[in-house]
Regions:
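Amphipathic alpha-helical linker/stalk segments
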Residues: 63, 83-101
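Extended low-complexity intrinsically disordered regions
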Residues: 138-147
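Hydrophobic/aromatic residues within well-ordered alpha-helical segments
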Residues: 78, 85, 89, 124-128
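Generic structural signal for hydrophobic core residues of well-folded globular domains
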Residues: 85, 89, 110-111, 144
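Short, intrinsically disordered or compositionally biased N-terminal tails of bacterial proteins
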Residues: 1-28
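Amphipathic alpha-helical segments used for helix-helix packing
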Residues: 98-139
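Helix-turn-helix
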Residues: 34-38, 42-80, 84
């Protein structure tokens, strides 16, 4: 029983020590020296113009001005960065040429092989179908009132 008690204390001290170390590292981390929104916009422009497969990490580094390590630390991978750009697009799809180009890139380059990208594309197109229906309905009602 005593062995179990001491083993439990040891495990508790390891958890506390790991927790302290984790908190210490969080406090000592440097704040980001870039605006994530700006980086997403720059990546969005690049992906829309060059496609997903046509955009390299070097292209993203040049476009965003981030170091390669900072890009990977902030976003994990080119694929994750693209997903974040798509999620941002889903929140503010504006029917601009760039938005349509990016959606086309997602549907063509990644959606056939990536379930998460397919889901985001469905969310974008599904929400826009409702918008089209509302706009069309409003337009039809206006035409009917004219007659």
């Amino acid at each position: 029983m005593a062995g179990g008690f001491f083993f439990g204390l040891f495990n508790l001290s390891v958890v506390i020590d790991q927790s302290f170390t984790y908190c210490y590292h969080l406090d000592m981390a440097r704040p980001r020296a870039f605006d994530e929104t700006v980086v997403l916009e720059q990546a969005r422009t690049l992906f829309a113009a060059q496609g997903y497969n046509g955009t390299s990490i070097d292209d993203l580094v040049k476009s965003t001005g981030l170091l390669r390590g900072s890009l990977y630390k902030a976003f994990g991978s080119k694929r994750n960065l693209f997903e974040m750009v798509l999620i941002d697009l889903a929140g503010r799809f504006d029917f601009s040429e760039e938005s349509l180009d990016l959606l086309t890139v997602a549907l063509k380059d990644l959606a056939p092989v990536d379930k998460r990208v397919r889901e985001i594309c469905s969310q974008i197109t599904g929400s826009q179908i409702e918008r089209f229906a509302r706009l069309l309905g409003t337009n039809l009602l206006a035409k009917m009132k004219e007659n």
